[in-house]
From Swiss-Prot:
Organism, as annotated: Oryza sativa subsp. indica (Rice)
Signal peptide positions on this chain: 1-27
Placement of sequence motif Prevents secretion from ER: 439-442
NCBIfam families named in the record: amidohydrolases
Gene: ILL1
Name listed for the protein in its UniProt record: IAA-amino acid hydrolase ILR1-like 1
Amino acid sequence: MAAASSSRVLLAAVAVLAAALAGCGAGAALDDPAGLLRRAKEAEFAGWMVGLRRRIHENPELGYEEFATSELVRRELDALGIPYRHPFAVTGVVATVGTGGPPFVALRADMDALPMQESVEWEHKSKVPGKMHGCGHDAHVAMLLGSARILQEHRDELKGTVVLVFQPAEEGGGGAKKMIDDGTVENIEAIFGVHVADVVPIGVVASRPGPVMAGSGFFEAVISGKGGHAALPHHTIDPILAASNVIVSLQQLVSREADPLDSQVVTVGKFQGGGAFNVIPDSVTIGGTFRAFLKESFNQLKQRIEEVIVSQASVQRCNAVVDFLDKDRPFFPPTINSAGLHDFFVKVASEMVGPKNVRDKQPLMGAEDFAFYADAIPATYYYFLGMYNETRGPQAPHHSPYFTINEDALPYGAALQASLATRYLLEHQPPTTGKAKAHDEL
């Protein structure tokens, strides 16, 4: 009787344990996106990501200054037992999970903040005056660490290698290009990037094949004339008048020279000159940005911007010097999504959130340095992760001092990035041959 009783107790304990494991997302199959989402939504897991995101948010760092953020990333990777290499592009970190051999697929998160003062009053407000995570990069880092944790839980099941790229300086600093120049993406076949979106509903993802974000460049011009008294304009050469004509003429580049079906933008956002009501200054500085989806259109805009500024200044008897600032702010190419990866993304995302929650996204004239990876990696894909919830009230836009993150989005980002990587490895196994061959190392 004692033996039988002990057996029943043991069987009951086994049943309880099995039930617990069945309800635990950690036991989700690697090829089950919905199961990985359940894992990421578990209270402890989601709370861990929220904590990471808030710590990063409290201590924002600008491009190439992300030393504390990089240290946090490395500390968490150490805790997870994930190997990494550091530094790349000053503060960047590259980690790997899996076999160490092909195929290689990458996931990327940007780490930098913005030079702006946070206006949201809450417990985890930025502690650094004049700096704020106003674009969601704190969430991106937390989600990629969440993906890392999921992948590490399944490391023995991975059929290749997932490369985790924690990148500095997306906000105008061209951090992606410097990461590439430092050799971080060799042998990688595909890379996925994600951005939280303030206008896309929570639980919804959105993207499109082909151009998804525009190429971007900046320009600055110094227009020089001859200063003097405002009451004697005939003794001066007025650079303010010249700059005004330049600005009007620049607007004709899009309205009269660009194909209406080929979206382009030229915007002058900077005008500095003069400091007194009755003085015509010696010079004026103007500056702005230009955007296009096609490389040919982008290059044409660049050429014509310089021609128009120099020529129009000359008409007003002024001289102009144009600087495209590409040494400090490299031109961002258009972000182009691989058509093949789009079909793949739709399939995997539909399994996680349902087909109705995978939506088309109109191209944006904003720019993203994720585009640089297309110069070094055969297939690239960038998508948007919804976080809008009407019950939270109005959502301030990105780059606003009132911007906030709906932290309920973090599990979706962590699980989907992990699912995209693992499924990519499964579907892109190298062909087998009769003779064993040594794997290429990353």
